Every structure is written in C-alpha cells, then in structure tokens.
Amino acid sequence: MKFTLSWLKQFLETSASVTEIAEALTAIGLEVEEVIDKAAELQKFEVAYITNIKPHPSADKLKLCDVETKSGMLQIVCGARNARAGIKVVLANIGIEIPNGKFKIKESVIRGEKSCGMLCSEEELLLASESEGIIELSEDAVVGENFTKYYGLDDPIFVINVTPNRGDALGVYGIARDLAAKGIGILKELEISVIKSTFISKMKLNVQDKEACPLFTFREIRNLKNKPSPDWLRKLLKNVGVKTISSLVDVTNYISYSFGQPMHAYDADRIKGGITVARHCEKHSDEAISGQQNEIATAALQPRNDVAKCHALNGKEYLLTENDLVIKDESGIQGLAGVIGEADSSCTDSTTNIILEAACFNAKMVAASGRRFQIDTDARYRNERNIDRNFTEKALDIATNLILSICGNGEVSEVVKVGEKESQKKPLDFSACYLEKITGIKLNIKAIEAILNKLGFITDVKGEIIKVIAPSWRHDITILEDIAEEIARIYGYDKIESIKLPELDQDNNKLREHKRISSFKRILASKGYDEVVTNSFMSSEDAKLFAELKEELFLLNPISIGDNYMRPTILPNLLSIVSKNLARSIKDMAFFEVGPSFIDLNTEATYLTAIISGSYNNKNPHSFGRGYDVFDLKGDLELVADYAGLSIDKCIATNGTALPQYYHPTRAVNIGLGKNLLGHFGQIHPKILKYYDINQEIFAFELNITNLPLIKAKFGKRDEFAVSDFQANFRDYAFIVGQDHRVGEIISYINNFNKKLIKSVILFDIYSGDKLPEGKKSIAVKIELQADDRTLSDTDLNSFSKDLVAAISQKFQGTLRE
C-alpha cells in the first residue's frame, strides 16, 4: 500500500515529521517498508525554459534548443518530439548523474553541434517505466528552482506492508484513523455534501446471488465532460504508481486508495437494458456437481463447454466458467465482479453519461477468480480482503460529488441499490484483568475504553466488564484476544514490561520430542542427506497415486490448482525434487524432510521421510563403484531407530498389514512395534517412477514419529563396557519355518535366547524354493558365542545347539535344515 504525506493530511491533522509517522505506523502493526523522497533524490535537477528551437543541420530527428537556465543561456541537442519553444522543462546540468542508466552528463559534441546538458523525460528520472517525450512543467515553474515541487514530487511516499486481515488499512482514511488513535494527530471528520437527485434511473438492477454479492449500488450521472483530472489528483495518483487516464477513471482510483472501496465507472450509453450480477452460466440441477469440496477440486481442472469471453480492460481475453461472478447486461459480460471491468463498456474521452458503481463481493469468490485467471488489480486486492459494507454508499456519494466538481454539474439519479448494510456485531465481554493476564499491560477500564473508542469500537462499561462491539470495517475482530491485540498495539508493545521466562522442564515431553527430531536431522545430515521443506499441499492427481482420495482433504480455497489437496505422505514432494534434479543431470542425491502427513480431517501425523538414489561411490582406479541399494537405506534408518531405542530387525512387520502400493511389492517392508505401524522402507514401485519421469532406482523410508514411543531420558551411571578375554565361537544354523513367520521376530527371539553366551546374530540367507516343502522358507543365521568367565568347550557348544533347535521347534515349529 502506497500513499503520500499530503494524501494522509487530507484526513489527519498532524504536525508530525515523516520519521515520526513512519515509526508510529510500524509500531501499530502497519510496517513501513520504505519512505520514498523523490525531492531529495532529484534535488539537482532544475527548471529551465526553451526560448528558441531550430533543426539540427546534420540530423533530421535532432533539434538545437536554446535553453534559459539560472546560470545563463545554454545550447542543448534534443531528440524529443515534444521539444518546442515556450515550454518549461527539466534540465540536467553537466556533472549530474541520470538515475536511469547511471551515467553522468558531460559537455559533448553531437553530430558536429555542442550540447551542454540534457532535457529529461520521466523514464530517464525513473518516474515512469516509459515516456513519449521530455517532461513539460506548468507555466508557474520558476527557472533555476528544483523542479520537484512543481511536479508534485516534494511529497514523501510511504510504502507499508498490510497484513491480509487489515483490509481497512488499504485506504488512507483507515491509516489516518489508526494514527489518530496512536496520538499522531486528529482524525478529520468527513464532510459529505448532500446530493440532490434530479431523476430516477430506468436502469434495472438484478442481483441473483446475494451471498456472492451482499451489496450492489450505483448512480447514473448524465451530461458530464470527461476532461483531464486536476493537477492535485494526477499528482497523487502518479506518486503511488497509478496511471492517470481521465477524470472519471481517476476519481474511482482515488476513492479506492482513499477509503479502500473499489469503484467502477461504466459508459452508460454502452450498457444495454439492465445490470445483472450473477454466477456465469449457472448449471441445471441435474448437471450439478455433488459436494462443495468436489466442485472446488475439479472445476478448474475439467474443460467446460458453457464458457463466455470477457474482453478485459488490460487488453486480455478470458474464458469464464460457472464459478465466476460476473456483471452483465443484455449484450453480454461487462466485468468480472470485484476483479476487472470489460473494455467494451469502459469510459473514453467522449463519455458523457456514466453508471457509477460501488459494490461488495464475496471475498473468496473474488480471490478464486483472480487467482485462476492470474489477474492482479487494486480492486481484487481490496475485495478479497473484505470491504466495509457500511461505508459503500458514503463512498458512492463522495465519488459523485468529486465527479460533479471536476466534470461539471450533470444530472444525477437516485441511488439504485440491492442489498443492505452489515448488521451490528455481537458484543464481547472484555476486562482489565483479562488484558493484564494475556499481555501484562495494566490499564484501567477508562483507559481501555478510550483506546477502543478512538479505533471506532462501540463500548459499554458495566462495572469491571466492558462490552465491546467491533466496527464494521474490522472483519478480523472476532475473539477477546483480537481486542487485547488492538489495545496492545496502540498502547505500545515497547511499553510492556519484560519478565523472566519460567525455567524449562527438561523432562517435558514436547521438549524431548523436539530434541529427538533435531537429533534425527543431525544423524541424517551426517550421513550426507540434505534437508528439504516442501508444501503441505499437493495436486490431487498426484495424491491419488499414494492414497485413496478423501473428500474432506480437498482444499476449499487452494493457493493454486496444483495445490488443492492435503498431502497423505511427504514422498511425492521428494520424488518431484528428484525428477527436477534428474532433468538437470544431477543423478546422485539424498534428501529428507520432517513434516505432517494427513490421513483424514482428524488425523495428522509427523513423519520423517528420506530418499536416496544414484551412486553410493563413483568408479575410480581402486573401485568399480556401485549404486545405492536398499541396505544402504536400511543402515541409515537403523541409526535413526537406534537413537529412538528401537531395532529395525526386531521391528520388521509381516503381520498381514498391506504394503503401500507405491512401494515395490517384494523389495520393501513395513516396520512396526506390536500392533502399532511405524512406517515402511524399501524400493519405490517402477510405475510411480515412470509417472515422475525418473529412470533410476529410488529407495525411501517413512517413519511415523508420532507413533514412536518417547523413551524417557535416563540419567545416572552407565554400565561399564567389558570385553571378554576368552575365545569367541561362531556357529551357522539354517532353520526351516513357515512362510507366515516374521524373520525379525525369529532373529529377536534368538538374540534373547541366551544373553550370557550370545553376542550377535547375523542373518545371511533367506531361501524358499523347490527344495523345500510348500509354504516353507529357510532362514540362515550366524551366531557369535562367547562366555565372560571361560573358554566354551565342545560340550557347551553342543548343548547350546541342542537347546536352541528345541526352542525354535517349540516356538516356531521350525526344524534344522540338513
């Protein structure tokens, strides 16, 4: 949002300096990004006067100008078409640097003629993106003085960042109201002259969708002269970057910037019949799409036959769908409501009769249409942040008065209106105790009431309670915390006393969870993984490859068509990154992300998802090199699981839970703890890779951190690490068991069979085939045996083998393979 100091002073009586105003704006939440002072930047450029002009003897397109300056007469070579005798211009003397191009003016000879300066255009001074000639100043400009005050540039420009909830601050009047509440000045009372209508408009108004357009007003004005706007208006608009077109259009822009109420002026002679506000091409009930979410999710993706064209003011043509709110007459579309007008009914220099519109439209519909067509206009920007419906008719009156004062006293109709003002909001019970509780600010009820009244709130004190009604322009005030924030920002955040924060409970579950996630990240980073952060939304087309789509997970108001669904897993986002990297010939990569995945509307889980692909090490004189495989991934997952106090081998789940369809059916597994599914790891299915245009193997793991047991931190002395001095023995066993038995469960059982002797159990083979009975598999393990107090004898080893075989037989109905 841009505005100038003089514009602010139209509504605020203040003697505060630019610096004081800027500091106050930032303090009340209207962050000042920049203060532009063109007068300071262009102070060396002065007013000059062209006394005589003649053609250049050696160049048809150049002219020799005799220029009067404060230091005397100069000859300047100029090629501008509008250069002529008798006009005041902007002079850059020798030694001055031109902003556009950053070059210094030197005395030069151009095609044999001396030139002692430069006559400047708006483009050269960075006052416009393009210009057709040199700047022409008003006749009252004094030769030798700085030109900025004659060109309206001696007016500092404030550039503020307005948050989406503060639609009321998109008008200079709203900003002035906040500054007055802060004590920077006194808010001027708006003086709106009563308009005497001279006729009743025959133009009928039909609003078919009151929810989409809660208020639409217009006034017909006849016999106007659409002449150029006065200097004060043109300067204001030019300083904030708005192109001046004609007085009729300039007034609507002025009202939009002054009060945050978008307006539009139609050429009344081009409007046929009445005005209708409706959703374009409403579908019949037998064709209606079932479910609002389904409509939102699919409307933008599917081609439609019932489309019409809007030839917009920006010169572009748009195809409309039934989701677009339009303004139309008998001849067709006359505008995309709240976004942009139609070129065919726009005002021109010859326009004498207008229809002046001031309306309020559904913010979500305006945002959706603007986003779908990628149209960014001041009207859209304000409409999608909600308009003060109770000020709309006042804005229409102010605009009407201004047009009549500039364009002549034309004939004015009565206001044509459909819709009503917004009803008063429900009061909220606020108190000084509540304010102190959540902000630490100690104020009495009278001080609280004074601040709120300055901001336009309606208050009623009942003892210790103050009933507060938010003003119509503050759509964001809905709860007590909002009121507390309003008081705090006007009172001053810098005045809130600082207090010492309470000591953190080191055994707090949230703190331990945060530390654990941080450790997971460090572990993977140490293994060469790069952390990424991706959007929690994704395309429903991608999502259906990874999970069954659920209606409640579609976004009603997506940021873009490609982000219309809440992600069921992080994996698609990582695969998209892999695909983009491969397109740039980057083949070796390892990524991870910690973030939410959404199962349904009530179930959200935090996942650690990692992905590797490419070469583990490259070919070199000492090695042929090899690519990543699933065991590399498993090793990295084991490090993470070990920190969480788990063993991956013990957590491999084969209890009948189906593997997600996006994993390779025989090269991936589920991991779990009891009946609790913790995630999956393995190779990604080739069909998924083909969809993402990935031509190399991808390995990934997903770990549900939410379901991971949070092991309480152990404090105290660790057990002493002891190494046996006696010889270790190794024995290989191959057991035949049923296919339904989990390998991890068998390994875990063997590990715990005799903890005094067993030091390690390593799985080295799994076999199933013709040499085994149907429904059976062979599991081969290497067991390291070692006692702490003696060397194991053959008797000890044979006894161990006998007991182990018997235990496997009893527990898993397994037999020793011959």
From Swiss-Prot:
FDX-ACB domain ranges (all copies): 724-817
Cofactor annotation: Mg(2+)
Biological process per Gene Ontology, one example term: phenylalanyl-tRNA aminoacylation
Domain B5: 423-498
Pfam name, any one: tRNA_bind
SMART domains associated with the record: B3_4, B5, FDX-ACB
Domain (tRNA-binding) ranges: 39-148
An example molecular function term from Gene Ontology annotations: magnesium ion binding
Homology family: Belongs to the phenylalanyl-tRNA synthetase beta subunit family. Type 1 subfamily.
Protein name: Phenylalanine--tRNA ligase beta subunit
Species per Swiss-Prot/TrEMBL record: Rickettsia conorii (strain ATCC VR-613 / Malish 7)
Gene: pheT
